[in-house]
Each structure stands twice: as C-alpha cells, then as structure tokens.
Amino acid sequence: MKTLLLTLVVVTIVCLDLGYTMTCCNQQSSQPKTTTNCAESSCYKKTWSDHRGTRIERGCGCPQVKHGIKLECCHTNECNN
C-alpha cells in the first residue's frame, strides 16, 4: 500500500511539474538560437560594444552588470531572444 501511495505522489509531481523551470535562450551574439532550462524565474540579455562590434550574451537570471553594458531582464519563456 505504501508503494502504491508513493508511486501516486511521484506521478502527481511529474504531471503537475511542481519544479517549474524557465526556458531561456543562451546563444551568444548572432549564433543560432539555443535554449536551456533554468531554475531562476527570469532570463537576461546583455548587450555591449567592443573592438569586435556589438556583443550579446543571453542566459538565466538577472545579473548585475558594469557601467556601459545594457541589461534587459524578462520573465517569460524564451523572452530574451
């Protein structure tokens, strides 16, 4: 009986996806789109210019950035593309 109850709990957790994760884009600059699942509740896109031109970094969370770097944070799946 305990095994059946444990199985039902596990199936419920899997079906309800209680450990919801965000899907954020993580490709750099003009690379083809790639995504990753994140535990954070936000995605970011950092943009800056250097000797190679405009650079873009995407990922999970909402990091602090240095002066001169544009940061955009958002809260929906793949919102940082």
From Swiss-Prot:
<dbReference type="InterPro" id="IPR003571">
    <property type="entry name" value="Snake_3FTx"/>
</dbReference>
<feature type="disulfide bond">
    <location>
        <begin position="74"/>
        <end position="79"/>
    </location>
</feature>
<keyword id="KW-0732">Signal</keyword>
<dbReference type="InterPro" id="IPR018354">
    <property type="entry name" value="Snake_toxin_con_site"/>
</dbReference>
<feature type="disulfide bond">
    <location>
        <begin position="62"/>
        <end position="73"/>
    </location>
</feature>
<keyword id="KW-1015">Disulfide bond</keyword>
<dbReference type="GO" id="GO:0099106">
    <property type="term" value="F:ion channel regulator activity"/>
</dbReference>
<keyword id="KW-0872">Ion channel impairing toxin</keyword>
<dbReference type="GO" id="GO:0005576">
    <property type="term" value="C:extracellular region"/>
</dbReference>
<keyword id="KW-0528">Neurotoxin</keyword>
<dbReference type="Pfam" id="PF21947">
    <property type="entry name" value="Toxin_cobra-type"/>
</dbReference>
<feature type="disulfide bond">
    <location>
        <begin position="38"/>
        <end position="60"/>
    </location>
</feature>
<keyword id="KW-0008">Acetylcholine receptor inhibiting toxin</keyword>
<dbReference type="InterPro" id="IPR054131">
    <property type="entry name" value="Toxin_cobra-type"/>
</dbReference>
<dbReference type="GO" id="GO:0030550">
    <property type="term" value="F:acetylcholine receptor inhibitor activity"/>
</dbReference>
<keyword id="KW-0629">Postsynaptic neurotoxin</keyword>
<feature type="disulfide bond">
    <location>
        <begin position="24"/>
        <end position="43"/>
    </location>
</feature>
<comment type="similarity">
    <text>Belongs to the three-finger toxin family. Short-chain subfamily. Type I alpha-neurotoxin sub-subfamily.</text>
</comment>
<dbReference type="InterPro" id="IPR045860">
    <property type="entry name" value="Snake_toxin-like_sf"/>
</dbReference>
<keyword id="KW-0964">Secreted</keyword>
<protein>
    <recommendedName>
        <fullName>Short neurotoxin 2</fullName>
    </recommendedName>
</protein>
<comment type="function">
    <text>Binds to muscle nicotinic acetylcholine receptor (nAChR) and inhibit acetylcholine from binding to the receptor, thereby impairing neuromuscular transmission.</text>
</comment>
<dbReference type="GO" id="GO:0090729">
    <property type="term" value="F:toxin activity"/>
</dbReference>
<feature type="signal peptide">
    <location>
        <begin position="1"/>
        <end position="21"/>
    </location>
</feature>
<keyword id="KW-0800">Toxin</keyword>
